[in-house]
Amino acid sequence: MNKIRKGDEVIVLTGKDKGKRGTVQAVLGDKVAVQGVNIAKKHARPNPMLGTTGGVVDKVMPLHISNVALVDANGKPSRVGIKVEDGKRVRVLKTTGAVVAA
C-alpha cells in the first residue's frame, strides 16, 4: 500500500521548491509528479502529423517520494501510518491521527 497516492495534497520538504504545495498527478514507483512543482523547460519538436507546434514547453518533473509529505487539516506536513480498521488497511496521519480518505 502506497502512503502517497494520486490526488493527495502534499507539501515539498526539500529542494528548490521547498514549502510549495500541490496535488499529486501521478505516482511513478518511488517518485511522484506534483502539479505546479519542479517544472522544467523542455524543447519540443513540431509534429505536423499531430498538429503540434514546436517550442519551449513547461513540463512537470517527478520528485522522490521521500521529499514530499501529506498536508494535515492544520496545513502542516505529516507522516503517514497504516492501521487496520474493520479488516481493511487505512492510511492515518501521524500528526492528527485522522484517517486519510482513500
Swiss-Prot record:
Record-level GO cellular component terms: ribonucleoprotein complex; ribosome
Originating species: Cupriavidus necator (strain ATCC 17699 / DSM 428 / KCTC 22496 / NCIMB 10442 / H16 / Stanier 337) (Ralstonia eutropha)
Listed GO biological process terms: translation
Record note on quaternary structure: Part of the 50S ribosomal subunit.
Official protein name in the record: Large ribosomal subunit protein uL24
InterPro entries in the record: KOW (IPR005824), Rib_uL2_dom2 (IPR014722), Ribosomal_uL24 (IPR003256), Ribosomal_uL24_CS (IPR005825), Ribosomal_uL24_KOW (IPR041988), Translation_prot_SH3-like_sf (IPR008991)
Sequence similarity: Belongs to the universal ribosomal protein uL24 family.
UniProt keyword annotations, A-Z: Ribonucleoprotein, Ribosomal protein, RNA-binding, rRNA-binding
Described function: One of two assembly initiator proteins, it binds directly to the 5'-end of the 23S rRNA, where it nucleates assembly of the 50S subunit.
A molecular function GO annotation: rRNA binding
NCBIfam families recorded: rplX_bact (TIGR01079)
